[in-house]
Amino acid sequence: MFKTDNYKNKTVVITGGTKGIGLGITKAYLSLSAKVIILARNKPKKQIQVKGNKALFYQCNVRDNANVEEVINEVFKANKCIDVLINNAGGAPLINSLDASMNFNNAIIDLNLNSSFTVSYYVAKKMIKKSSGCVITNISSVTATRPTPGSAAYGAAKGGLVNLTKTLAVEWAPRIRVNSIITGYIETENSLIHYGSKKDMKAVAKTIPMQRMGTPEDIANACIFLSSANSSWITGTAIEVHGGGESPAYLNSAKPK
């Protein structure tokens, strides 16, 4: 039977929850009256709130092990528990692997893989004290599942995140469920930087079976499901939220002129 979860007494920690996909996830949990805590390097210009529910902000460099440990301890001390963790912080510009320095490549891997492991580690140390019901969701990308020129380090990191998810799900069961979401092309405030003009974005949308780019809300809905009682037997999986992926190139090539 479908269950309508009550998030009013749940504490949700979201990394990178001030913009893009992360902001959509933050707003979704706030709309359900969850206590939302954002971990990010830069404080938003104004407090994020929905229906009078306000997100709390903790400044944190998720690539800094000592800083993460300190902040998670502060969050736990103030809130007594952490029920849900969304590892969303990440991203990378497109650049050919040989045009980037190894310092750059390593920084991308740190942000998109190692930081999620670090935050999960310190949060799980707190979560494991509960008998059950805690959830960690890692935000991955379709780049993890197929070659993407210009995203070697990013794709490797996101692929590693999917594997990390599966391993931690086994290690930390049954008290903590761990899943990942493989996101497709998502339209955010920075889309023009990645995809070019609005005309280019429409062209990209036409390659998707659902004929549109995704929204942060599409990813947020998947997060809500994975942290709900309706997914209580789902762990160690990667849910693909990408509108059907991309239409195979041969379909367009084979179309009669």
Write out the residue ranges for each language-model feature.
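Short C-terminal tail/terminal secondary-structure segment
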Residues: 2, 146, 224, 235-257
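Conserved glycine-rich cofactor-binding loop
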Residues: 18-20
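Substrate-binding pocket helix/loop in short-chain dehydrogenase/reductase
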Residues: 96-109, 204
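Active-site helix of classical SDR
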Residues: 120, 157, 165
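Alpha-helical segment proximal to the catalytic Tyr-Lys
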Residues: 125, 169-174, 232
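Residue(s) in the substrate-gating loop at a strand-loop-helix junction
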Residues: 141
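C-terminal helical subdomain
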Residues: 180, 199-230, 234, 241-243
